[in-house]
């Protein structure tokens, strides 16, 4: 069976926490650190053989190691997200064929979604967890000029994003060659004109960005664990 790796990104600087939370990845959420939720979900999924965790400093690495799968390779993160991903890709074992890339600041990913993504990537080479946008989105073109975008074609990208190892390594090499700034991995693959499949996520999978997000994530976890259905509007 083809070996699969998971790159768990934990090296973010928590800049938008405005000092309220020193390290959002280690912040307590439903009785355990934010990082532990993603780590345990990937373990339960049974689709990952190799774990790589990017970290921001030695103290954080020690704390992360208490919740990381065994064994895990820890790799120092870079200044930006793309630098951390590139550093982790460079450390992949030679026999890895597929790669999950996941922001640990999204702790609500589900094991069944990982299984579905793993099945799709073996067919498509590139797949991203995503959801459709329901808000009206406008592009601001300056001087009060707005352009309404057709939301039927708009999706919000989430993580995990999953790729064949050869494809994502080629894509990140193209990013480095052109000295581009990207904020997700699918953007790198787009440079190669390679199609990216989307797996629609019907469940909330928000990213922890501000202090207020912690309370929202706690609420979502409580609803999920108690199996109380989400209201439909």
Per-range role (PLM):
Residues 1-57:
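N-terminal glycine-rich phosphate-binding loop and ensuing alpha1 helix
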Residues 2, 155-233:
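Conserved alpha/beta core of the MobA/IspD/sugar-nucleotide pyrophosphorylase nucleotidyltransferase superfamily
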Residues 4, 71-73, 154:
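Short, conserved active-site loop motifs that form the nucleotide-linked donor/cofactor pocket
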Residues 8, 35, 88, 102-103, ...:
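Residue-level signal for inorganic ion chemistry
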Residues 28, 108, 148, 162, ...:
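Short aromatic/basic micro-patch
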Residues 58-64:
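Short, charged/polar "capping" segments at the starts of alpha-helices
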Residues 73-74, 79-144, 158, 229:
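Conserved beta-loop-beta/alpha segment of the NTase-like Rossmann-fold superfamily
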Residues 146-156:
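A short, charged helix-loop
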């Amino acid at each position: 069976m083809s070996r699969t790796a998971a790159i768990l990104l934990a090296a973010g600087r928590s800049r938008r926490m405005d000092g309220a939370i020193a390290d959002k990845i280690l912040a307590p959420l439903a009785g355990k650190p934010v990082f532990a939720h993603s780590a345990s979900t990937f373990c339960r999924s049974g689709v990952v053989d190799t774990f790589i965790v990017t970290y921001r400093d030695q103290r954080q690495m020690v704390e992360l190691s208490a919740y990381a799968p065994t064994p895990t390779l820890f790799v120092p993160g870079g200044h930006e997200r793309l630098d951390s991903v590139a550093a982790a890709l460079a450390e992949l074992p030679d026999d890895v064929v597929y790669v999950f890339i996941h922001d640990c600041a999204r702790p609500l990913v589900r094991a069944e979604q990982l299984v579905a993504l793993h099945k799709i990537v073996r067919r498509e080479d590139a797949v991203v967890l995503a959801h459709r946008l329901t808000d009206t989105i406008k592009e601001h073109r300056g001087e009060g000029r707005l352009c309404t975008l057709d939301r039927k074609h708009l999706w919000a990208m989430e993580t995990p994003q999953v790729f064949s190892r050869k494809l994502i390594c080629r894509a990140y090499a193209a990013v480095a060659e052109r000295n581009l700034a990207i904020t997700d991995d699918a953007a790198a693959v787009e440079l190669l004109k390679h199609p990216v499949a989307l797996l629609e996520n019907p469940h909330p999978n928000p990213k922890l960005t501000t202090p207020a997000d912690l309370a929202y994530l706690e609420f979502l976890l409580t609803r999920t664990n108690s199996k109380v259905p989400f209201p439909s509007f």
